[in-house]
A protein has these predicted regions:
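C-terminal segment of N-terminal export signals and the immediately downstream linker at the start
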Residues: 16, 38-61
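A short, well-structured juxtamembrane/interface segment
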Residues: 69-84
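Glycine-rich phosphate-binding loops that contact phosphosugars or nucleotide phosphates
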Residues: 93-252
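Acidic, Ser/Thr-rich low-complexity intrinsically disordered segments
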Residues: 275-299
């Protein structure tokens, strides 16, 4: 698509025409607003490219906003995590509710990632193993903390796309009780839009960032899905997974950099699909296997 192409009205603003350059300069929030009144006409003969272009523009703008607006808190969190890791502590990560576990998985036992990450994936609290109610019942947090051996002085990265999931808030409250430092990653503006009376909120009516020592915003827009299709009432195509994974990878990148700058020697996984991977990964795996629950035996 070249810069002279226009967007034509589709979502209730018939006749709207916006230059692509104007769209690109609008930032994430402006782009979202524009998309409600216009869609890209696309390159002639390239059927189906309109929504791909819209989606990429919004995601890229949001990523830039994360780097700009969350920089201070990401660096503050990385400073804390790098100290913990250099002291020999594990970095605990829990993705609470639905698909939020994906972001926790993104930094656990992952190529280019730290070996000292303790991924917490209890049965019943994510989309793969949850029953109809288990992820929405209060009272699981103490058992999760004990099972994964999260102790006073440790740090927990608590990920919940929107920040109001019942299990997530339960985990945040338990962290405060146990003297565990809490880093949260969630969509803070999204959480504010959800009424306190919403039936799937925690009884405390809190969001996880209300309890955080360091709160990082993943800049997920409300209501997560962002694209419009003419003739369809619902928005389509979510943003939460890609933006949250980007955010947590920014955090871990800075953590590893700071570990090295402070004189540490971070142990980094390499891909299990490249030559000599076993020679590199097996000694690291052997070191952490009895401390990290989900490092199951592979050799």
């Amino acid at each position: 698509m070249n810069t002279s192409e226009k967007k034509t009205g589709s979502c209730g603003k018939s006749g709207t025409s916006l230059d692509r350059r104007e769209f690109m300069k609008a930032g994430a929030s402006g782009a979202l607003a524009m998309m409600c009144g216009a869609s890209f006409a696309g390159t002639p003969g390239a059927a189906g490219t309109d929504l791909m272009t819209q989606y990429s523009e919004v995601i890229i703008d949001a990523m830039r906003d994360i780097v700009k607006d969350e920089r201070a808190n990401i660096l503050k969190a990385a400073d804390l995590l790098s100290d913990n890791a250099n002291e020999g502590r594990l970095i605990h990560v829990y993705g609470a509710g639905g698909h939020s576990a994906i972001a926790a998985m993104e930094i656990f036992w992952r190529a280019g990632g730290l070996a000292c990450v303790n991924g917490m994936f209890p049965v019943g609290t994510n989309v793969m193993t949850a029953g109809p109610t288990t992820a929405k019942v209060e009272g699981f947090a103490p058992y999760i903390f004990s099972f994964y051996d999260v102790n006073k002085g440790d740090t927990l990265i608590l990920v919940n796309f929107y920040g109001l999931n019942i299990t997530a808030v339960d985990m945040a409250l338990e962290a405060k009780k146990r003297g565990v430092k809490l880093i949260t990653i969630n969509a803070q503006k999204f959480a504010k839009k959800v009424p306190k009376s919403f039936k799937w909120r925690h009884s405390s009516k809190l969001d996880i960032n209300d309890l955080a020592d360091i709160a990082i915003d993943n800049h997920v827009p409300y209501p997560d899905a962002i694209l419009k299709v003419k003739g369809l009432k619902e928005e389509i195509t979510p943003t939460a997974t890609i933006l949250t994974c980007f955010t947590i990878n920014c955090l871990m990148s800075e953590t590893i950099r700071m570990m090295v700058e402070k004189g540490g020697k971070p142990e980094i996984w390499v891909s299990n699909n490249i030559p000599n991977c076993d020679e590199h990964n097996k000694p690291i795996h052997d070191k952490y296997r009895h401390r990290v629950h989900h490092l199951y035996p592979v050799w």
